[in-house]
C-alpha cells in the first residue's frame, strides 16, 4: 500500500517527536512518525539528570555557559555549535514547557535549578531524577493530541527512497541525494511505501 504525507519522521525519540510537533503546529502539512516499537519505548525516557539552560539572567549568562561547555569539552567542541545550542536553549525549554513538560519548581514558582559537574552556576532544569521520562511523557501526549500527526507503531523503516529508486545513478560522490520517502515493514509483515515531500 502507498501512503502520502507532507513529512515523514523516522524515529520517535525527542528529536523525532519535537520535529513532528513543530511542523504540525506550524500548519506545514500532515506528518507521519514511523516508530519501530511503541511510542513510549524511545530511549529518551532513560535520560535522568536534566537539561542545561540559562534561565536566571540575574545570576547567569550565555557567556558563562558557553565557557563552561568549552572547558568541559577540553576546547575541542565547535565554538559556533556550542554558542548556538546555549543561546537557543531557553527557547527550547519554553517549547518543552508549552508541550506539557513539568520541570520541578520551587515554592515561589521559579525553576528548581541544580548545579552539576562542569557548570559554574545553577542552570540544570530537571523533573526529579527522571527528566527524560517526563519530557517523553509530555511529547507523547502532545503528539497523540495533534490531529495532523499520525503515528505508525511497530513499523520498521527498511529503506529510504532516493533518486536511485527512480533510475538515477547515485554514488558516494553524488552532490545531492534527495529523500522521497521510505519503504516500511508493517505489522502484517508487508512492505508499504510512504512518500513525503
Predicted regions span which residues?
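Core beta-strand elements of the Rossmann-like FAD/NAD(P) dinucleotide-binding domain
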Residues: 2-5, 189-197
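N-terminal Rossmann-like FAD-binding beta1-loop-alpha1 element of flavoenzymes
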Residues: 7-33
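Conserved structured core elements
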Residues: 17, 90, 133, 193-196
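A generic local structural motif
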Residues: 18, 186-190
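Short amphipathic alpha-helices and their capping/turn segments at secondary-structure boundaries
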Residues: 24, 96, 190-191
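Conserved N-terminal/central alpha/beta ligand/cofactor-binding core
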Residues: 30, 35-187
Amino acid at each position: 500500500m502507498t501512503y502520502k504525507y507532507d513529512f515523514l519522521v523516522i524515529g520517535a525519540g525527542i528529536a523525532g517527536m519535537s520535529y513532528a510537533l513543530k511542523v504540525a503546529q506550524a500548519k506545514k502539512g500532515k506528518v507521519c512518525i514511523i516508530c519501530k516499537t511503541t511510542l513510549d519505548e524511545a530511549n529518551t525516557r532513560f535520560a535522568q539528570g536534566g537539561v542545561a539552560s540559562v534561565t536566571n539572567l540575574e545570576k547567569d549568562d550565555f557567556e558563562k555557559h558557553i565557557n563552561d561547555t568549552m572547558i568541559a569539552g577540553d576546547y575541542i567542541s565547535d565554538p559556533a555549535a556550542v554558542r548556538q545550542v546555549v543561546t537557543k536553549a531557553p527557547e527550547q525549554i519554553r517549547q518543552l514547557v508549552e508541550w506539557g513538560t513539568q520541570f520541578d519548581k520551587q515554592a515561589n514558582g521559579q525553576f528548581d535549578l541544580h548545579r552539576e559537574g562542569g557548570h559554574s552556576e545553577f542552570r540544570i532544569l530537571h523533573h526529579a531524577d527522571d527528566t527524560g521520562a517526563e519530557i517523553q511523557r509530555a511529547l507523547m501526549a502532545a503528539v497523540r493530541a495533534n490531529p495532523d500527526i499520525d503515528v505508525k507503531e511497530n513499523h520498521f523503516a527498511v529503506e529510504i527512497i532516493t533518486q536511485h529508486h527512480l533510475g538515477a545513478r547515485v554514488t558516494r560522490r553524488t552532490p545531492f541525494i534527495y529523500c522521497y520517502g521510505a519503504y516500511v515493514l508493517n505489522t502484517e509483515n508487508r512492505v508499504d511505501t510512504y512518500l513525503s515531500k
